[in-house]
Amino acid sequence: MMASYPEPEDAAGALLAPENGRTVKEPEAPPPSPGKGGGTAPEKPDPAQKPPYSYVALIAMAIRESAEKRLTLSGIYQYIIAKFPFYEKNKKGWQNSIRHNLSLNECFIKVPREGGGERKGNYWTLDPACEDMFEKGNYRRRRRMKRPFRPPPAHFQPGKGLFGSGGAAGGCGVAGAGADGYGYLAPPKYLQSGFLNNSWPLPQPPSPMPYASCQMAAAAAAAAAAAAAAGPGSPGAAAVVKGLAGPAASYGPYSRVQSMALPPGVVNSYNGLGGPPAAPPPPPPHPHPHPHAHHLHAAAAPPPAPPHHGAAAPPPGQLSPSSPATAAPPAPAPTSAPGLQFACARQPELAMMHCSYWDHDSKTGALHSRLDL
């Protein structure tokens, strides 16, 4: 008798078939263990990762979770280190940042200790106006808050000047109207544009006069005074003034002596320029009655004298010795003054005429022929 084995399909079906109508349940995950207080246990921060909170949020968090709602600086440090182990290292850096935020942020108020004593440090608390600066207790999001208006100091109140209601003190000359609405004074204008444009130029000091020019100017002034005292008709005074003017003019064409006013009728012996034209003085007396070529006058000459000593009369086209058209510089009377010799040395024509004057008795014809040229 042979044994029969069941088919594999039937065996698999028998294993999968429920026994007594029961279904097989899959295993479930174990429930989480309850934490303290019946809630879920908070995740511990990673000591190597910096917390995502600003220093203002850390300070506010420490003050709010304190019992008295105020903490000293050391208490804030201890809370941050205990709450976030990341700040156990590099204490110097973040503690300086905590101090700066306490001093510069207006939401933190310093409260002095009661009674003083040996204990140092002040309390820090939150401003009541900044209690809700974080949205719904989220320290990662901070609201934009408007700063409360604080009145300015008394000396900077709007509409008032820096030195009181008058706006001026001690004669400073700044009026109250010159200040703006916030009490700040406009810069004073000490120099106006009109004053700068209408200012007078500074006088320039005159250049010093050379020593030689001073000496000659003094001599010329003394000679002019002597000539004025002697009278305009005196030939000696004119010769003295004219002789003194010669050496001063020799220092340059723009000498100071030439610009000095000379007596009327006196001509400079250097360039023939003098003062305004005036009536010529009467001719001086001569030792002999015949005319000579070196006695020329600027006024109308008398009618020509008849020729003498056998000299022929000049033709009508030639110049006569007494013609007013040839107004040469008048020669001074013969004198022994040194100025006369200097003038003759500077002007060769006058020197020739003076030499011809002294030799006139012997060379009368040669003088007339030389002048006719």
Swiss-Prot record:
<protein>
    <recommendedName>
        <fullName>Forkhead box protein L2</fullName>
    </recommendedName>
</protein>
<dbReference type="GO" id="GO:0002074">
    <property type="term" value="P:extraocular skeletal muscle development"/>
</dbReference>
<keyword id="KW-0539">Nucleus</keyword>
<keyword id="KW-0221">Differentiation</keyword>
<dbReference type="GO" id="GO:0006309">
    <property type="term" value="P:apoptotic DNA fragmentation"/>
</dbReference>
<dbReference type="InterPro" id="IPR001766">
    <property type="entry name" value="Fork_head_dom"/>
</dbReference>
<feature type="region of interest" description="Disordered">
    <location>
        <begin position="1"/>
        <end position="49"/>
    </location>
</feature>
<dbReference type="GO" id="GO:0009653">
    <property type="term" value="P:anatomical structure morphogenesis"/>
</dbReference>
<dbReference type="GO" id="GO:0003677">
    <property type="term" value="F:DNA binding"/>
</dbReference>
<dbReference type="GO" id="GO:0030154">
    <property type="term" value="P:cell differentiation"/>
</dbReference>
<feature type="DNA-binding region" description="Fork-head">
    <location>
        <begin position="50"/>
        <end position="144"/>
    </location>
</feature>
<dbReference type="GO" id="GO:0043065">
    <property type="term" value="P:positive regulation of apoptotic process"/>
</dbReference>
<feature type="compositionally biased region" description="Pro residues">
    <location>
        <begin position="277"/>
        <end position="286"/>
    </location>
</feature>
<keyword id="KW-1017">Isopeptide bond</keyword>
<dbReference type="InterPro" id="IPR036388">
    <property type="entry name" value="WH-like_DNA-bd_sf"/>
</dbReference>
<dbReference type="InterPro" id="IPR030456">
    <property type="entry name" value="TF_fork_head_CS_2"/>
</dbReference>
<dbReference type="InterPro" id="IPR018122">
    <property type="entry name" value="TF_fork_head_CS_1"/>
</dbReference>
<keyword id="KW-0597">Phosphoprotein</keyword>
<dbReference type="GO" id="GO:0001541">
    <property type="term" value="P:ovarian follicle development"/>
</dbReference>
<dbReference type="GO" id="GO:0000981">
    <property type="term" value="F:DNA-binding transcription factor activity, RNA polymerase II-specific"/>
</dbReference>
<comment type="subunit">
    <text>Interacts with ESR1. Interacts with UBE2I/UBC9. Interacts with SMAD3. Interacts with DDX20.</text>
</comment>
<dbReference type="GO" id="GO:0043028">
    <property type="term" value="F:cysteine-type endopeptidase regulator activity involved in apoptotic process"/>
</dbReference>
<dbReference type="GO" id="GO:0005634">
    <property type="term" value="C:nucleus"/>
</dbReference>
<dbReference type="InterPro" id="IPR036390">
    <property type="entry name" value="WH_DNA-bd_sf"/>
</dbReference>
<feature type="region of interest" description="Disordered">
    <location>
        <begin position="272"/>
        <end position="339"/>
    </location>
</feature>
<dbReference type="GO" id="GO:0003700">
    <property type="term" value="F:DNA-binding transcription factor activity"/>
</dbReference>
<keyword id="KW-0238">DNA-binding</keyword>
<keyword id="KW-0804">Transcription</keyword>
<dbReference type="InterPro" id="IPR050211">
    <property type="entry name" value="FOX_domain-containing"/>
</dbReference>
<keyword id="KW-0832">Ubl conjugation</keyword>
<feature type="cross-link" description="Glycyl lysine isopeptide (Lys-Gly) (interchain with G-Cter in SUMO)">
    <location>
        <position position="25"/>
    </location>
</feature>
<comment type="function">
    <text>Transcriptional regulator. Critical factor essential for ovary differentiation and maintenance, and repression of the genetic program for somatic testis determination. Prevents trans-differentiation of ovary to testis through transcriptional repression of the Sertoli cell-promoting gene SOX9. Has apoptotic activity in ovarian cells. Suppresses ESR1-mediated transcription of PTGS2/COX2 stimulated by tamoxifen. Activates SIRT1 transcription under cellular stress conditions. Activates transcription of OSR2. Is a regulator of CYP19 expression. Is a transcriptional repressor of STAR.</text>
</comment>
<feature type="compositionally biased region" description="Pro residues">
    <location>
        <begin position="301"/>
        <end position="318"/>
    </location>
</feature>
<dbReference type="Pfam" id="PF00250">
    <property type="entry name" value="Forkhead"/>
</dbReference>
<feature type="modified residue" description="Phosphoserine">
    <location>
        <position position="33"/>
    </location>
</feature>
<feature type="compositionally biased region" description="Basic residues">
    <location>
        <begin position="287"/>
        <end position="297"/>
    </location>
</feature>
<dbReference type="InterPro" id="IPR047515">
    <property type="entry name" value="FH_FOXL2"/>
</dbReference>
<dbReference type="GO" id="GO:0045893">
    <property type="term" value="P:positive regulation of DNA-templated transcription"/>
</dbReference>
<dbReference type="GO" id="GO:0000978">
    <property type="term" value="F:RNA polymerase II cis-regulatory region sequence-specific DNA binding"/>
</dbReference>
<keyword id="KW-0805">Transcription regulation</keyword>
